[in-house]
């Protein structure tokens, strides 16, 4: 596997913000209306597949295929699967279900075939990955030819302890990724995070400033954090950056060890929920319209009004280089 896939944006703050030279001055930047929307952003339909998985990996892959085919049949150009879609979610399962990211692996083969057969861009949720003696929570992205075009390892691990609620430590079995991931498609550039990554606004902000029009988050919030934060965070990331945000969850199974909130959701650049569902197995569809981004960014022009000269401590590496 070519290492370039593991985070298409390399570490180093300046490379995250290639066009932010204007941030070093006190002048408010003058930007034309058309430049506020990436030129490569095209309309498309997205399908979020909210799967109910089992302890049988082959069964999970077969079900994913059926639902991806269904989503494509209903006009989806971009399809998203949930976090840890090929395995039960839980630290006790990750080692058992882990695979290397290589062409001979079952999940790689299945996802590649799904993308190729449907001629869609497939954001393959995430799977437990084994690499050099470590385990990662890893997402693969395939293009319509079935080619792997991006891999994202979950950067922020889900370590929480809610009094009277859920206690969970992904770091007991997983290692964190160390790079952001952005991927170019024929519909524009996408940013990618996994579940807990959505709580860190810097990722979406960096992606948006680098021309991403959509953030994709496979995620499995639970019954404590889900009702409080799932939609809230999706809307926050969308309105913070005036971009589209799509969050794809597993369906809820109360007989499983981990209970997913479900509610896969798509939010537009105004922070409006344009498609969602409940906790049951389903497919969520949304038509992504670039003109909505244009309207949002011209109506509330935060892109021309940010004052990095005032809050430059948000970017300590840039400040140091100055």
Curated annotation (Swiss-Prot):
The keyword Hydrolase applies. This is Hydrolase C26A3.11. Signal peptide: none annotated. Keywords: Hydrolase. GO terms for cellular component: mitochondrion. Residues 44-290 form the CN hydrolase domain. The active site is at residues 83, 154, 195. It comes from Schizosaccharomyces pombe (strain 972 / ATCC 24843).
